[in-house]
Amino acid sequence: GFESLSLRQLGEKMKKFLITLLTLPLLLSSYGGMWEPYQMPSLKKELRDAGFYKNVESISNPFEYPMNAIVSLGYCSAAFISPEGLIATNYHCVERDFIQPNSSLENDLFEKGFLARSKAEELQAAPGQKIYVTLESKDITNEILQGTSDETESLERFKIIENNSKAIIRECETSDEIECRVRSFYSGETYKLEKVLQLRDVRLVYAPPAHVGEYGGEIDNWMYPRHTGDFALVRAYVGKDGTSKVYADDNIPFTSDSYLKISAKGVEEDDFVMILGYPGRTNRLLTFNQREYDLSEGFQNYVDFLESRINLIETHTNDEDGS
């Protein structure tokens, strides 16, 4: 049966669990995890050992096929899968801004799913939903750090970097359909300028029922192996002149020159699989000092924070008799 635990006992078990997690990287492959495209050539041997036999250069340029078929919803990765702007993404990526706004008590798309049998039936996403297509990425470290030195105080350094970033972004954003971002890599070691096209008319094409599409994360039944239809389809539209426009009835599908081709062959056990996308972050290249801080202070501070939350909950949930 299930073990009955108090919040404090649960906290103690979580401590042990966190310690166990800290030891896992020692057991994992040294080349697992997330890598930037330009790093692929340095992994040529490892990729071949893993079963990738094509030219590594073909997955090293984010602006050539197949890399340039990968797009972002701003909070999720996605990919063009047709020349008419059809995009595949995860089910949980369309729940809030595509399914929810188009659902009602009488027409619950979470319960029954949705399929547009023609482009005319595709459903408008919530206002502000966009697809982001990366057009350019370049190193701007020297420009961002201009005016700083090793002696610059932290606050002053932050202000200089912030002002330099704003100036670079203003110069980069030449139209309403272009958005530019300054990204920091390796804890400020390098900076890159990303120039992206914003597609502002996005519509829901297909989503399975929630009981099919939800990927997990629930309290019960969160274990492997499991089978989940965690995917959905949306389509990007533009104005008749081909430029990015907000939703309008006469908008036309975006022409995607690069798109992934879906194989009907499926996969076999031990087939090579690579996931391309826009992950939030990785800590695989933290410095020794950063790891040392985590071990000496960071993790303990987090445990202390969790314990304070447990104490607060217990204080406000005890019965009058203290139980």
Q: In which residue ranges do the predicted regions lie?
A:
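Short, positively charged low-complexity motifs
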Residues: 1-2
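Compositionally biased regions
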Residues: 5-7, 30
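Short, intrinsically disordered, charge-balanced linker/junction segments flanking boundaries
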Residues: 8-11, 24, 318-323
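Terminal presequence/propeptide segments associated with secretion/organelle targeting
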Residues: 28-323
